[in-house]
Amino acid sequence: MAKFSLIILASMIFALNGCSSQVVNYDRYSLIEDVSAISIQSNYNVEVSLNESLNQLGIVLKTSDVSLRSANKHLWSSSLRSQLESIFKDVLYKENFAKNTSFAIYVNKFNGALDGTVEIDLSVAAFKNNKQIIFKNYVRKGKQDASGYDALVIKLKGFYKEICKEIVADIR
């Protein structure tokens, strides 16, 4: 009887061990691979805030007209907020933009959709000498060039850089 109990116990341990040894792979995506450290450390005053649905580790997909899903295995390499701030600082730095302007950016949409649509919707308030000089909404919507998360991230980054350059042009 004790031998039988020992065999059952050993079988249960092996079964539990098999369940816990499954490896889960996560893909991490970066928007700032080509951003220089000097741009990130520059003294530009940029503050990005995100719609709560974007405050996730996972890349967000629109699954219907009223639902969004944060991916479980396709994650941002670091906070989306800090990556978007870094990209905007990089654009400002490369454009030799004056550092006496501060920016408040609210990102409402920064997502893909199941049909391959990519969408960004954000507003920008810029201030110079404590006076608001611009308050404007910027939108981009289009299709991915290929399927998959890589293509989604590439398109989101491209759209966001376009918007950043447009903001700089609107203020100049």
Locations of regions flagged by a protein language model:
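Sec-dependent bacterial lipoprotein signal peptides
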Residues: M1-C19
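Short amphipathic alpha-helical face segments that pack within enzyme cores
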Residues: V23-V24, Q83, I87, E162
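Short amphipathic alpha-helical signal-transduction/dimerization elements
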Residues: K89, Y93, Y160, C164, ...
